[in-house]
Every structure is written in structure tokens, then in C-alpha cells.
């Protein structure tokens, strides 16, 4: 049995197919979704989504949004999404290191918030390509 997954960003449809299982990061923690899941509407944190299709796992970095589960389908609306296959590993590592440094030297509320968001985005991109293992400490 499968469920239909649609991942949509403002400028494109990132994913639209039947899948076997989904694991994603919500604002209250990770959830797993299988066919016949109870209806749910949840906010998504910056993090990754794992998708199982034909016994193989694929990952994507999601930059926050919302997910709705209903009638063996999941629709995800995100600010931005990148498939692991679209992420340059070298660039992702460099961005992560830079974001770590920026977060460490951030001063003031606004700068700390912006640096933390940049760090979370960089961390999600690395997790999507399995360069770093779970969990990564801040």
C-alpha cells in the first residue's frame, strides 16, 4: 500500500508520486507517516524529510512550511526544498562551517536569530546528504 506525496515550493513542484513511508521534522519532533495515517495538519521545522519508495530511501532538505495528511495523501507546502541529489557536498560543508562561525560570533537578538536560521538551513542540507550523522549539536 502507498500514499501520495506532494511537496510544493513557491516556484515549483519538488515531488509528486506514490511513496511507501515518510519521516519528517515537525515543530514538535519527528513523525513517521505510513498509509492510512490519521488526518493531521502540522507545522514543519527546518530539517529533512526521508522518503521510502520501492524499498529505497531518498532525502530532501526542507526549509520550514506545513504538512497536511488526509485520505492516504500528504501535501507539503515549503518555503524552499532541495533534493539530496541537487546539493553540492563541498558547498554544503563550507556553508555549514561558515554558519557555525557566524552563529558563534553573533551579537544582539536580530543577529542571533538570523545566524541560527542560517545554521539550521546549513545543517539540514548536510543531513540530507548524510555528510553528518544525527543528531548534530548546536
From Swiss-Prot:
Q: Name one GO cellular component term.
A: chloroplast thylakoid membrane
Please indicate which superkingdom the organism of origin belongs to. Answer: Eukaryota
One Pfam entry for this protein is ATP-synt_DE
Q: Name one GO molecular function term.
A: proton-transporting ATP synthase activity, rotational mechanism
As given in the record, the signal peptide range reads: none
Q: Carries keyword Chloroplast?
A: yes
Q: Does the keyword Transport apply?
A: yes
Major subcellular site: plastid
Q: Which InterPro entries match?
A: ATP_synth_F1_dsu/esu, ATP_synth_F1_dsu/esu_N, ATP_synth_F1_esu_C, ATPsynth_dsu/esu_N
Q: Where in the cell is it found?
A: Plastid, Chloroplast thylakoid membrane
Q: Which family does it belong to?
A: Belongs to the ATPase epsilon chain family.
PANTHER family per UniProt: ATP SYNTHASE DELTA/EPSILON CHAIN, ATP SYNTHASE EPSILON CHAIN, CHLOROPLASTIC
Q: How does it assemble?
A: F-type ATPases have 2 components, CF(1) - the catalytic core - and CF(0) - the membrane proton channel. CF(1) has five subunits: alpha(3), beta(3), gamma(1), delta(1), epsilon(1). CF(0) has three main subunits: a, b and c.
What this chain does, per the record?
Produces ATP from ADP in the presence of a proton gradient across the membrane.
According to UniProt, the name of this protein is: ATP synthase epsilon chain, chloroplastic
Organism for this UniProt entry: Anthoceros angustus
